[in-house]
Amino acid sequence: MRRAALWLWLCALALRLQPVLPQIMAVNVPPEDQDGSGDDSDNFSGSGTGALPDITLSRQTSSTLKDVWLLTATPTAPEPTSRDTEATFTSILPAGEKPGEGEPVLIAEVDTSSTTWDKELEVTTRPRETTQLLVTHRVSTARATTAQAPVTSHPHRDVQPGLHETLAPTAPGQPDHQPPSGGTSVIKEVAEDGATNQLPTGEGSGEQDFTFETSGENTAVAAIEPDQRNQPPVDEGATGASQGLLDRKEVLGGVIAGGLVGLIFAVCLVGFMLYRMKKKDEGSYSLEEPKQANGGAYQKPTKQEEFYA
């Protein structure tokens, strides 16, 4: 009697699954375009990355349906219990993925009611979504701890060990969390510690115009050190001698007199050169007739008769 009831239940389940499988495949798979060449199909995104995500999900669902069909088609299988059903659903999950801690595990009992198929689909799809969120959360946590290393390497002596988590930067994907009430004091103490480790005021590269009030000897050292470091070494004796010569009036008057004498000499030299050039031009290009040897008496030119043969 028990075996006959099992056979009737299996037959009813098989008849229920037959119309559902073609309906899901018809909804998920796009219609075939027989007029096109096949290159512009809707199954591809156009960027060369492959099929669209919905096609991948539909194939995974179809593989799940095949597993369920093979499981229910075995004639000698015992009645499915809660453990068998849980094992069937957990085997569908990809390798290496586990549901998060604290999340309820959904166990769907195989039943002939109309809501059985909906429960199976929910169980096969929800764990995958939650595991994807867990993977991204782990990656962001790793990034946060990696960026946190340089901050915790130099903690302040007054900061408690448990408060270093408030200084960790948040990853781009995580929302910004407000630090606790003690976080502000920790940041201020670290800033004060960094301010005390800064270089002194007198060690700057440029000449400083302002001096800050500090205790006694430190102020004198800070005011004297920049002048000694920034200026190159100079011979004090040579500098004093050159400044003394320029300050004397006799030396200044001699320099001015020498300049004037040089200017006059240059003017005289230029005038002499111009005079020589003028005399040379007059001698070479003279238009006057040459003087005669008889005292300059005028003589008529002799006529030359021409005879024509």
From Swiss-Prot:
Q: In its UniProt record, which GO terms are filed under biological process?
A: canonical Wnt signaling pathway; cell migration; myoblast development; positive regulation of exosomal secretion; positive regulation of extracellular exosome assembly; positive regulation of syncytium formation by plasma membrane fusion; receptor-mediated endocytosis; striated muscle cell development
Q: Any transmembrane segments, and where? A: 254-274
Compositional bias of kind Polar residues? 142-151
Organism this protein belongs to: Cricetulus griseus
- Tell me the membrane topology, using the record's own terms: Single-pass type I membrane protein
Designated name of the protein: Syndecan-1
Question: Gene encoding this polypeptide?
Answer: SDC1
Which stretch is the leader sequence?
1-22
Q: Which GO terms describe its molecular function?
A: cargo receptor activity; identical protein binding
Answer whether the UniProt record assigns the keyword Transmembrane to this protein.
yes
Attached carbohydrates are found at S37, N43, S45, S47, S205, S215
Q: How is it modified after translation?
A: Shedding is enhanced by a number of factors such as heparanase, thrombin or EGF. Also by stress and wound healing. PMA-mediated shedding is inhibited by TIMP3.
Provide a GO CC annotation, any one. external side of plasma membrane
How would you summarize the oligomeric state and partners of this protein? Interacts with CDCP1. Interacts (via C-terminus) with TIAM1 (via PDZ domain). Interacts with MDK.
Instruction: Pull the Cytoplasmic topological domain ranges from the record.
Output: 275-309
Q: Provide the family line.
A: Belongs to the syndecan proteoglycan family.
What this chain does, per the entry, is described as: Cell surface proteoglycan that contains both heparan sulfate and chondroitin sulfate and that links the cytoskeleton to the interstitial matrix. Regulates exosome biogenesis in concert with SDCBP and PDCD6IP. Able to induce its own expression in dental mesenchymal cells and also in the neighboring dental epithelial cells via an MSX1-mediated pathway.
Which residues does the annotated region (Disordered) include? 28-57, 142-185, 283-309
Subcellular localization(s) per the UniProt record: Membrane; Secreted; Secreted, Extracellular exosome
Q: Which superkingdom is the protein from?
A: Eukaryota
Task: Quote the biased-composition stretches of kind Acidic residues, using this chain's numbering.
Answer: 32-42
Q: Where is this site: Cleavage of ectodomain?
A: K249, E250
Modified residues annotated as Phosphoserine in this record: S284
- Pfam families the record matches: Syndecan
